[in-house]
Amino acid sequence: MKPENKLPVLDLISAEMKTVVNTLQPDLPSWPATGTIAEQRQYYTLERRFWNAGAPEMATRAYMVPTKYGQVETRLFCPQPDSPATLFYLHGGGFILGNLDTHDRIMRLLASYSQCTVIGIDYPLSPEARFPQAIEEIVAACCYFHQQAEDYQINMSRIGFAGDSAGAMLALASALWLRDKQIDCGKIAGVLLWYGLYGLRDSVTRRLLGGVWDGLTQQDLQMYEEAYLSNDADRESPYYCLFNNDLTREVPPCFIAGAEFDPLLDDSRLLYQTLAAHQQPCEFKLYPGTLHVFLHYSRMMKTADEALRDGAQFFTAQL
């Protein structure tokens, strides 16, 4: 679609979203558009420091977990000693960016609002790691903590997965992987999915929305996919195109959050409509006036804080 035909998104977003877009960080260098992935990752980490400030304090522990690929870093956020469940968090970043630091505030707030232990998994990034390595390492970490729950003093009898953007896909893919391969890591009480992508290759929102403001043009989305997948056949894998998986049975309760001006919004709508049509427990909520990645901006956006509270409330209601 010609850029001129797209919606004038920056004119339509909410006042608080505009405040975020217009917030300048004077000490921050320019985005290294032509730089290496390593430089872009470094910039992303620096840029997120401002948005992560002021998060709730709580007991935090870091552990390296063994997998067949090597060790993966994890970070445990423990808001109380008697947690009713454990929630695994997978960060967004198009499979190529992000880490436990870039999403620190999100995980702390989720732990605070749910009063559950949250474990962030620093899964391997692409293109160094190709599909399905990230999912396999997430599952390995889940199994490790299930086996060592007593040693780490965590409750693994009931678990959940949560993620934003690419992390939302990984969250649901990991839950389906455990179901399909009959791996016991505790009862999956719920899955929290903020503005994820789940397998659509084209849609109305992908045509009308997306630009330099969110890094989600059709060219951007193609680049993320090519970095993540090992080959063309992976596009149809039921753990990448999740609509090719069986969504008619034993899908854990899903909280599906959509951002109004997100090109990936139709992925969330289709996921909700598919699950609802087959009587799978799910809830969809649209957050008006928001862009993709709005969850990061709870320092300024009440809507971002609301979205985290909504997800936490949904999860605890399943326990």
UniProtKB/Swiss-Prot annotation:
Residue numbers annotated as active site: 165, 262, 292
Superkingdom of the source species: Bacteria
A matching Pfam family: Abhydrolase_3
A GO cellular-component term linked to this record: cytoplasm
Alphabetical UniProt keywords: Cytoplasm, Hydrolase, Serine esterase
Compartments where located: Cytoplasm
Statement: the UniProt record of this protein carries the keyword Cytoplasm: yes
ATP-binding as UniProt keyword: no
Any one Gene Ontology molecular-function term assigned to this protein's record: carboxylic ester hydrolase activity
Motif (Involved in the stabilization of the negatively charged intermediate by the formation of the oxyanion hole): 91-93
EC nos: 3.1.1.-
Function: Displays esterase activity towards short chain fatty esters (acyl chain length of up to 8 carbons). Able to hydrolyze triacetylglycerol (triacetin) and tributyrylglycerol (tributyrin), but not trioleylglycerol (triolein) or cholesterol oleate. Negatively regulates MalT activity by antagonizing maltotriose binding. Inhibits MelA galactosidase activity.
Subunit structure: Homodimer. Interacts with MalT and MelA.
Similarity comment: family membership: Belongs to the 'GDXG' lipolytic enzyme family.
Protein name, per record: Acetyl esterase
Organism encoding this protein: Shigella boydii serotype 18 (strain CDC 3083-94 / BS512)
Lineage, broadest ranks: Bacteria, Pseudomonadati, Pseudomonadota, Gammaproteobacteria, Enterobacterales
Name of encoding gene: aes
